[in-house]
Every structure is written in structure tokens, then in C-alpha cells.
Amino acid sequence: MNQNLPEPNQKKWIPDGFHFLGPEDSKYRRTLLETISGVLKKKGYSEVFLPAFDYSSTFIQTVSAPDSSSLFRIRDLSGNEISPSIDLTVQAVKGMAGFSHQRENQNIFYIGRVFRESTKGSVARKEILQIGAESIGVSGKENTFKILEELDEIISLLPLENKLTLVLGNVNLFQSIVQEFELKQNEIEILSKLLYQKNVNEIQKIFGEKKNHTDLIRLLSSLVLNFDLNSLKNSLNINSLSKNLQKSLSSILEETYWIFNSWESKKRRIDLCIDFSLLRDLNYYTGFVFQGYLQDSPDPVLTGGTYDHLYEMFSGVQKNASGYALMVNTLESSLKTPLFNLSS
């Protein structure tokens, strides 16, 4: 007798966190994807197709500890531990680092799924469709601004119900501060997590009694809920710091000023705000980082930034890189009306 027959509920239902789209919803999704990919092709990006699985170690060495704990893991017949993708940026950069692709177009885009195990119960989505773009060989303030303009053009084509606000930070501000105070790696990990959560009280509790950490706490507290650049500069009191730290912080703030002022110079569909406590995946982000949020939605609808060391991890050759990903599922649920194929 076959002992592997599905339970009655398994015959009827799809596992929690996964979804089936019928013909009509699939048609609307296809139109949404073609609308976004049309902009990317016009901007000079070439499409690539990513593998569904990769070695688990590929993700573990690049993403943060909380993210790596949500990996689905299996062993293939050769004994290798493999996982469905939890980070498509990692796979895109890893793929392009292959020797045979180094002379091809280094501006690429992809459509793919990420899979994350969740402890939030049946309401949590475990499968997320993304469309993303990567530029290998370039980064910096000008390229970050170009990316933001691309995103604004994409969003302007979508009938979104709510306004999109993009939060811009730069992990180098935090890195410069913790390097100045010679913090240990475990302390940096704790601080980055608490800053991202905007938990100043816990930072003061942990580091308040440590010798010479008064300035550290003041600087880190300045990064929390301080969205105005001039106010942030005053709170940091840069002139009171060492020459090296003054130089580092001033340079980062000047680049951020440039992006913000350039953005505000004309009308945009996306609102831009500054938040230097936006500290994501310090294992590979190396400069500007951003997340986009729709009003009344707690989860980001887009993420991106600069990762100048990621390519080197897979090729041994240093190349700057930057990019972004849009969460298609969140976009779909935020449209006033479905996108219709204008050519039909």
C-alpha cells in the first residue's frame, strides 16, 4: 500500500505562503512585468535568467544572519547543501563574474523568485517575485542618482493607490564611526541591528557604561529619526571629531546633499527622505543603500544600493556594482486598477 498519498487537505490546498495565479491575474502580472522590463531595456539593460537553486554557502557568506536563518535547505544526491534563492542580487553578480560573461553587457536585469522560511505563521509570504537590475563596474553618487531616476520613471507608469517614499542612507557613515572607535565585529553587528530598529535606549544600556563611549552614543543617536541633513550635521557636531572622521563624514554628507538637492530640483513621483540608520546586509553593501515604502505598508516595495566587493567574492577581481529590486507581489496589491496591455 502506498504510504505517501497526500492528506485530504494537501489535495485541496497549496502550502501556506505560496500562491497560484489564475489566467486573468497572470495576464495582469505579465503586463506589469513587461511594463517594467520595457523601461529597463530602453535604458540599455540586457535580460538574464538566474538558476532556481544555488549552494547554500553562497547565500550564507553574503546575507545577514537573520536572513540566512530563513533559508530553505536540502541536500542533492552528491551531498551538497543547496537552497532556492534568498537573494537574487548575489546570484546575478555571481553569474556575471563567470569568465565567459565578462565581455558581455554588464548592465543586466532579471525576473525571479526568492524563497524565505518564515516564523510569522500562515499569513507570511514565503515566495516573492522580484524584477531587478544590476550595473556591474559602476557605483557612486552619480550612478545612485541615475538608479533613482530609473525607479521614478518606472513608478510614474504604474497607477499606484498610495504615494511611494524612498528612504536613502549610506552604510559608510556608520562604518566610519565604528572604525573610529575600534569596535569588535560582534559589537558592530549588535549596533547595526539596534540602529536599524531605532532602539536608542538599548544602545545606551549596552554601551553607556563603556569607557570613552559618550561620543559614540551621541553620534549613533544622531542617526536615528534624524531625516533632515542640516539637523543631522548639527547633531553630529563634526568639528569636534578627529580629522579623519571629520573628513569621512563630511564627504558622505556632501554626496548625500548632492543627490537630495538634485532630486528636489524637479517634480518627482517618488518622495525622497534620508535615514542613515538604514543598515542592511553589511556583509555586502558598501555605500548608498535605499528602500522604498508605500503608505500604510510595513514591507519595502523596492530595495537596492551599492556593493563594491560582491563581484570580487566570486571572481577575485574587484569591480564596483550597484542595483535594485522591485517586489512584484507588493506592487500588484497596490495598484488602483490592473495594468492592461495597451496593444491588445
Swiss-Prot record:
Localisation per UniProt entry: Cytoplasm
One GO cellular component term noted in the UniProt record for this chain: cytoplasm
Disulfide-bonded cysteines: none
Top-level division of the source organism's lineage: Bacteria
Keyword Cytoplasm: yes
PANTHER family: HISTIDINE--TRNA LIGASE, HISTIDYL-TRNA SYNTHETASE
Protein family: Belongs to the class-II aminoacyl-tRNA synthetase family. HisZ subfamily.
Job of this protein: Required for the first step of histidine biosynthesis. May allow the feedback regulation of ATP phosphoribosyltransferase activity by histidine.
Full protein name: ATP phosphoribosyltransferase regulatory subunit
Provenance organism: Leptospira interrogans serogroup Icterohaemorrhagiae serovar Lai (strain 56601)
